[in-house]
Amino acid sequence: VIKYYQSRNKSILVLCPKKLYDNWNTFKSPYENNPLLRDRFNYHVFYHTDLSRRSGSSNGYDLERINWGNFDLVVIDESHNFRNGGKVTTDENDENPRENRYLQLLNRVIRSGVKTKVLMLSATPVNNRFNDLKNQLALAYEGEADQINALLNTTSTIDDIFRQAQAAFNRWSDLPDSERTTKALLD
């Protein structure tokens, strides 16, 4: 997917946890240990936490000068870290409410600037509720439920679908172990 966007001169952002930076940096480097050297990847790597920072530097980039809305593709490694949805933190005396990383990603990268596509990667998804999955999916449709509702071609909204799925799962999980089967869940 990255190569496809790169071949069309599109700008690519990879957001990853700090511990994965070296992996992503190796894949775009001229290092001998780069297994994808011939692909000549070109993308920008930032940490998930960089979204909340307004100053300082990250991997040689001045964060004050980054145009977050200029990326055609954002690849989110360990995307389950964005499962909690949008929240704004405020204190009683706080005149400057702060958006969490999820809202920073949505507002600064996905919604602003060029039309941005989202590729979410997670080998070990940690979803505690169906709402966690819904929040991740919302990144792909810019948090605008009407967009996905129009495409679903169902009588239920995306919110209703996830609410019903959670209710069905809750009923199933309350069953005795002997009755908690895949068939019982799908019925």
Walk through the language-model features, giving the residues of each.
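SF2 helicase/translocase NTPase motor core
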Residues: 1-110, 114, 120, 144-187
